[in-house]
Amino acid sequence: MILAAVIALLGMGYVFMGREKTMADRLRSGGGTADTAAGLTVRAAGFALLGVIPGSLYLGGAGRSVQAASLCAGLAVQLCWMLPKLRAQEPASLTVAEICAKDRFARAGLGAVEVLSLLSLTAGALAMAARVLASVFSLHTTISLGAAALLSLMLTVLCGAAARRNMDRLGVALAAGTVLAAFVLAQEMLGSAKIPLTELLAPKKAESVLGWTTVASDALWGVGAVGLVAFPHRALAAEREKAMRRGGRIGTAAIALLTLLCAGAGLLGRAADATLESRTAAETILIQIVTMESLPKPLSAVLTAGLTSALLLSAGAMMTEVGSIAAWDIALPLTGETREKPLMRTAMGAAALSAVLAFVLALDPNRPLQDYALAGLLLSTVTAAFLWARFCRWEACPLGEWMGLGLGAAAAVGWALIPATRLFGMIGAIPCALLTLLPQLLIGRWTQKKAEKAAQASEKPEKTDEPEREKAEEAAEAEEVWAEAEEELDQTEETAEVHENAAAEEAEAEAAEPTEEEKTNGSFDL
């Protein structure tokens, strides 16, 4: 199961290499927490880190039932994140900007929870990669790894990132160097005896004689490992040539810090053999599987190279994702900045800062990998539960969203810090999801009922005023009838006056005309 998860992680990483978008493209399209391609790689890294937790629980004294329940809970968390993506018809419907359009602070809070989750997973991936290197390399090899990586990074900075095609070709060549170095290391570093679990991280003696094959293999391994993690720095560059050069320098500087601090983590891990506990040694079960004698040496070398490359690639993808989330889901809603250049600076600065924090956390050789993986995956549970509620179109208010995110994140951190609850692993996903969903559901229903009561209260006065309204309507109708009657009366009076005037005029006209007798008398006078 663990090896299958590692192989799946490696395959997802290579698919991500060919299909990734630049940071500027993500900012233009609105890609943040929910719909970026790097999110798939992050969840795949969760699968690999999840494989460490059941083995730690079982070897630490937990029963098989607890181990199985923890594994099932972890798989359920991943499916809870993946299923809404599969159900969605188009990626645009998954953006956090649309999901959290009601409240910009809820959007920023969701981004902050996801940034913490990615930071924890990144530190766990880097710590795991450092322990893989410490289990395979000798002391001088670990130092040679840092020197070779630094040299290759200087060459990368001088060449610059002029085009994506050139970086792809360089990455393919460096990946081939990793495979070649793995085969060389299989013949030199892997012994014929099985490595005991308790002595897996024990310091190895430095070789007295350094052959040219050893130095060549160290250089090839360092160049190959840096080449695989050099892909994410391409995502830190914008499309313009000037921004690409600037983003390339920032990315390569972050990769140089990654390589040097990973080498330092390997050295500290070897120097801290006396402080290693049984649970810390038990968490190296994955390393023992790829370095045990029962596997052929070439296959063991390929698995070691694949595991290291996949972990470093996932760490780089998660750093890029942190930058995108910080710019799109935190800085944009809080500041209202919509210009591309400030958002790009915020994204690159957040990616570099998260890289430094993750490297510092990964330097602790006594920190169990379970702490990193458990905290990161439980915080991812909070994010997945929140987004699942939004995908299901729950009626929630900003207060419920804030309380759900706060309680879920507090439960995740507390579950990972308390030793008694930490033993149960990913079973903590259940209370974290419930504490995230219940405030949204309860407060959403409370606000809905409150709105319904307010609506009913506004309707009640209208019902009591119905008789008065009817009386007012009747009075208005009576006034209208009275006004019409008055108008008709006025019209009849006016017609009567007109008739009287006409009759008077006719009478005057008749009086003014002479009669027939007067006409005859006048004729006789003539």
What are the language-model segments listed below?
Residues 1-52, 156-159, 172, 178, ...:
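Membrane-interface "cap" regions at the ends of multi-pass membrane proteins
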Residues 1-14, 398-455, 459, 522-526:
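A generic transmembrane alpha-helix motif of multi-pass inner-membrane proteins
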Residues 8, 78, 113-124, 155, ...:
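Selective recognition of specific alpha-helical transmembrane segments in multi-pass small-molecule
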Residues 11-20, 122-126, 130-143, 147, ...:
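Hydrophobic alpha-helical segments and their helix-loop junctions in multi-pass secondary transporters
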Residues 27-92, 220-224, 233, 241-275, ...:
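Membrane-interface helix-loop-helix modules in multi-pass membrane proteins
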Residues 66-157, 220-221, 308-317:
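Helix-loop-helix module between adjacent transmembrane segments
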Residues 93-101, 159-169, 227-260, 278, ...:
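Hydrophobic, small-residue-rich membrane helices and short re-entrant helix-turn-helix hairpins
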Residues 102-109, 118-119, 324-366, 370:
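Loop-to-transmembrane helix boundary motifs in multi-pass membrane proteins
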